[in-house]
From Swiss-Prot:
The reaction(s) this protein catalyses: tRNA(Ala) + L-alanine + ATP = L-alanyl-tRNA(Ala) + AMP + diphosphate
Record protein name field: Alanine--tRNA ligase
GO terms of biological process kind: alanyl-tRNA aminoacylation
The family this protein is said to belong to: Belongs to the class-II aminoacyl-tRNA synthetase family.
InterPro entries: aa-tRNA-synth_II/BPL/LPL, Ala-tRNA-lgiase_IIc, Ala-tRNA-ligase_IIc_anticod-bd, Ala-tRNA-synth_IIc_core, Ala-tRNA-synth_IIc_N, Ala-tRNA_ligase, Ala_tRNA_ligase_euk/bac, DHHA1_dom
Gene Ontology CC terms: cytosol
Entry note: cofactor: Binds 1 zinc ion per subunit.
Organism, scientific name: Prochlorococcus marinus (strain SARG / CCMP1375 / SS120)
Stated role: Catalyzes the attachment of alanine to tRNA(Ala) in a two-step reaction: alanine is first activated by ATP to form Ala-AMP and then transferred to the acceptor end of tRNA(Ala). Also edits incorrectly charged Ser-tRNA(Ala) and Gly-tRNA(Ala) via its editing domain.
Gene responsible for this protein: alaS
Subcellular localization: Cytoplasm
Keywords from the named record: Aminoacyl-tRNA synthetase, ATP-binding, Cytoplasm, Ligase, Metal-binding, Nucleotide-binding, Protein biosynthesis, RNA-binding, tRNA-binding, Zinc
Length: 892
């Protein structure tokens, strides 16, 4: 296979993150790869908490446990890793959430093709200069070196052999394994090839990893060649975006930078003017918000266990870093809106689930803010008193009472040169779990024992709720706090059993009814009980609720009234669920079977066995079918028959469900026929409307559709109509004109922005030219160190770069100033060094950091360019004096 080689002066492409993603996938699709969508962050692998690598969804294939229909696939996989969470924001490239582009071969092509295509993609598609690429290989992989050197034509001095720790992949102590080869981008090839240190992240960044699975390792450690070799590759999207967009770090790419701009707008600052410490908090917020949005979108809820704890830890880290930069009010949803907007084209399910995501963010943020201030005060007190260690008991109190993840306490302690006694923390945690387990067992067993006992004494409840929503009944049993009682009073949370009831008890996926139970008390005042749930226990219906008024006594006659609105909503959702299963069988696959369901008052959820996502076109077809059946006004036929008769007439049963000899069959004539004990509408027209909200995968071979019906659709439409009305008022336009107005406004903003940037650049370049006569010449070099106030961060960077370009390779330029003369708390410093200055041992990033500290800030960057911020303009002249002193000492 011939590989076209570009000349060393080829132009590197400037591509957006979306364009990079599409270019990668299309490149491999053109070479016979099936494009597969990203798997969920919640993996179908009990050994792994979260999806941490692009290859993880294909792990069963690589291990030989599962066949893959296609021998070649390519994907962009969303991933989360938290093992380096403390480095997020502090380095240029660490993230918790990232996207991994990959191409995979399952026993098809191997090393030569993988290397050739990786090079072709890097050079021909992305336009990387070959002289900027360094290759690493496993120390014993002569085959890979021969391909890189002789087939591709890479300079042997830019092929680096590495040991097993760095360049040999394995799935575990035994199993498939093999060498890998990595492509690094060299930001400074002018520094030569004498001492290439790939761990120098100011010069090199790994952007593509090729794993050659060619061996199997047995229990004795012996390697044998695999009959079918596999390829597993990974290219970090954020890293490639940094390279192609020519920015200092991953966070300044178009994938993340809009998040930083949004954060800056919340506290009315310019991101580029900030010091390194504050920028680090911005990056933590931006990165973690991306992770949280995707975790919630994939069904994870904040909790103290497993994935839920990862989400909670990330969310609370975001809130804390928000406080560090001056944000005291809830703000997560505002950042999440931008995150969803940035990622919705690649992950449309985020848009579908945005309200769910926002609700979870609001819930968790509000919960943490309620205790954060008190927790911070306690922590501040601990920090001031602790000589070197925060005790485990104190850390546990912060965790248990104030919601501080212990990792967050560790992080804050480290910032103050302290540590947390983790052994003591774990001891306190274990003790609390022991107490909680004991208490929970006592309460749960006591309540369940009591319920079981009273049910066995009073017998089954006669359910009349199919025919009526009101019914007189008699109290057979009262349970208060797990104890069987003769009566209950105002404020008691109770469970009561009646001899008959119109309340539907939770079952068959349908939620139990809610409503009111009332009676005349002994003092003739009305007893009123709000029922919030009803469940079935051995044929008895247990009604749970709160006594709002009066006294209820065992044996009292009561009036039961089901909340008719809630019941109608549940009925509409339940019948809609039956229609949904019928539509799936008709529009997608007749072999689809139910895996589970939830029928709530405001929504429905249907889980089904299916191997792939349901397409957008199929979902649209399903909606049309269901709304068509609704408008056709089918009258339901509900009947009881023997299980054998039900099977004979073709009624669908839930696999694994136990049925009696007599079953209830719900028939929507010509559409659906199912065994079901739930409540339903009498005619499909009562449903009104049906709308699918989301379709996702929840496990291997199981998909989930969430939808709304009836009133839920009206609420959904009203919410959207409200948004349209607000936009109409803001734009002073009719609803059908809004899209055109938004497009026109965006075009106008772009045009004005270009004019503003052009004007700023013109001013900057004019000032730059006037500074050239202030250059100071030394023996073999020259420098310019000046103050330049009233110039924006972007403009001052442009000035510095222009001056270095014009002055030449032996020039060092450092400019600093207040970008806004009305703001006495902002300073920006920028340095740029020519190649000869770097060769003399100066590094712009390392040089500028200590200078910025004088102004109360910090910063850094690459050897040839760096920027920093500060908060004290009064010290700026002192900082520039130190810069001159150090330049002269180093160069003269």
């Amino acid at each position: 296979m011939a590989v076209e080689r570009l000349s060393s002066n080829s132009e590197m492409k400037s591509l957006t993150g979306e364009e990079i993603r599409a270019a990668f996938l299309n490149f491999y699709a053109e070479r016979g790869h099936e494009i597969v969508p990203s798997a969920s962050l919640v993996p179908n692998d009990p050994t792994v908490l979260l999806t941490i690598a692009g290859m993880l969804p294909f792990k069963p294939v690589f291990l030989g446990h599962q066949d893959r229909p296609s021998a070649r696939v390519t994907s962009c996989q969303k991933c989360i890793r938290t093992n380096d969470i403390e480095n997020v924001g502090r380095t240029a490239r660490h993230h918790t959430f990232f996207e991994m582009l990959g191409n995979f071969s399952f026993g098809d092509y191997f090393k030569k093709e993988a290397i050739q295509w990786a090079w072709e993609l890097s050079i021909n598609v992305f336009g990387l200069n070959p002289s900027h690429i360094v290759i690493s290989i496993f120390r014993e992989d002569d085959e890979a070196e021969q391909i890189w050197r002789d087939v591709i034509g890479v300079n042997p001095r830019r092929i680096i052999r590495m040991d097993e720790k760095d360049n040999f992949w394995s799935s575990g102590p035994t199993g498939p394994c093999g060498p890998c080869s990595e492509l690094y981008y060299d930001f400074h090839p002018e520094l030569g090839e004498e001492e290439i240190d790939l761990e120098d992240d100011t010069r090199f960044i790994e952007f593509y990893n090729l794993v050659f699975m060619q061996y199997n390792r047995n229990s004795s450690g012996t390697l044998t060649s695999l009959a079918n070799c596999n390829i597993d590759t990974g290219m970090g999207l954020e890293r490639m975006a940094q390279i192609l967009q020519g920015v200092a770090n991953n966070y300044e790419t178009d994938l993340i930078y809009p998040l930083l701009e949004k954060i800056a707008s919340l506290i009315d600052v310019q991101y580029e003017d900030l010091n390194a410490t504050i920028k680090a908090s911005f990056k933590v917020i931006g990165d973690h918000t991306r992770a949280c949005v995707h975790l919630i979108g994939d069904g994870v809820s904040a909790s103290n266990l497993g994935r839920g704890y990862v989400l909670r830890r990330l969310l609370r880290r975001v809130v804390r870093h928000g406080r560090l930069i001056g944000i005291t009010k809830p703000f997560l949803v505002q950042i999440a809106e931008v995150a969803i907007e940035l990622m919705q084209s690649a992950y449309p399910q985020l848009l579908e689930r945005r309200q769910l995501i926002f609700k979870e963010l609001q819930r968790e943020e509000t919960r943490f803010l309620e205790t954060l201030e008190k927790g911070e005060k306690l922590l501040a007190e601990l920090l001031s008193k602790a000589p070197s260690v925060i005790t485990g008991e104190a850390a546990f109190e912060l965790y248990d009472t104030y919601g501080f993840p212990v990792e967050l306490t560790e992080e804050i302690a480290e910032e103050n040169d302290l540590r947390v006694d983790m052994k003591g923390f774990k001891k306190a945690m274990d003790e609390q779990r022991r107490r909680a387990k004991s208490a929970a067992m006592t309460i749960d067993l006591t309540l369940q024992d009591t319920i079981d006992k009273v049910v066995s004494e009073v017998g089954e409840t006669n359910f009349l709720g199919y025919q009526q929503l009101e019914q007189f009944s008699q109290v057979q049993a009262i349970v208060v706090n797990g104890v069987s009682s003769q009566e209950c009073n105002v404020g008691d949370k109770i469970d009561i059993v009646l001899n008959m009831t119109p309340f539907y008890g939770e079952g068959g996926g349908q939620i139990g009814d809610r409503g009111i139970i009332s009676s005349a008390s002994s003092d003739d005042s009305e007893c009123l009980i709000e029922i919030d749930s009803v469940r079935r226990v051995k044929g008895a219906f247990v009604h749970s609720g709160l006594v709002k008024n009066g006294v209820l006594t065992l044996g009292d006659n009561v009036q039961c009234t089901v909340d008719s609105f809630s019941r109608r909503c549940a009925q509409a959702n339940h019948t809609a669920t039956h229609l949904l299963q019928a539509a799936l069988k008709k529009a997608v696959d007749s072999d689809i079977t139910q895996a589970g369901s939830l029928v709530d008052f405001d929504r429905l959820r249907f889980d089904f066995h299916f191997v792939r996502p349901v397409s957008g076109a199929e979902l649209e077809h399903i909606e049309k079918l269901i709304n068509g059946w609704i408008s056709e006004a089918h009258s339901l036929v509900i009947s009881e028959m023997s299980i054998n008769e039900a099977k004979r007439v073709g009624a669908i049963a839930m696999f694994g469900e136990k049925y009696g000899e007599v079953v209830r069959v719900v028939d929507v004539p010509g559409v659906s026929k199912e065994l079901c004990g739930g409540t339903h509408v009498t005619n499909t027209a009562e449903i009104g409307l049906f709308k699918i909200v989301s379709e996702t995968g929840i496990a291997a071979g199981i998909r989930r559709i969430e939808a709304i019906a009836g009133q839920g659709v009206l609420d959904y439409l009203n919410d959207r109509d409200g948004v349209v009305k607000i936009l109409s008022e803001r734009f002073k336009a009719q609803s059908n004109e809004i899209v055109d107005r938004v497009i026109a406004l965006q075009d106008e903003v772009k045009s004005l922005t270009k004019l503003l940037v052009k004007a700023q650049d013109e001013v900057a370049f004019t000032k730059a030219l006037s500074l050239k006569n202030k250059v100071v010449s030394l023996t073999n070099s020259q420098y310019l160190i000046e103050r330049l106030d009233g110039v924006t961060g972007d403009a001052i960077q442009s000035v510095v770069k222009t001056l270095v370009d014009e002055l030449g390779d032996n020039a060092a330029v450092v400019l600093a100033g207040m970008p806004d003369l009305n703001d006495q708390k902002k300073v920006i410093l920028v340095a740029a060094f020519g190649s000869e200055i770097i060769a003399q041992g100066l590094h712009a990033g390392q040089f500028l950091g200590p200078i910025a500290e004088i102004c109360g800030g910090g910063g850094g960057g690459r050897p040839n360019f760096a920027q920093a911020g500060g908060r004290d303009p009064t010290k700026l002249d002192d900082a520039l004096d130190l810069a001159k002193e150090r330049i002269i000492q180093s160069l003269d």
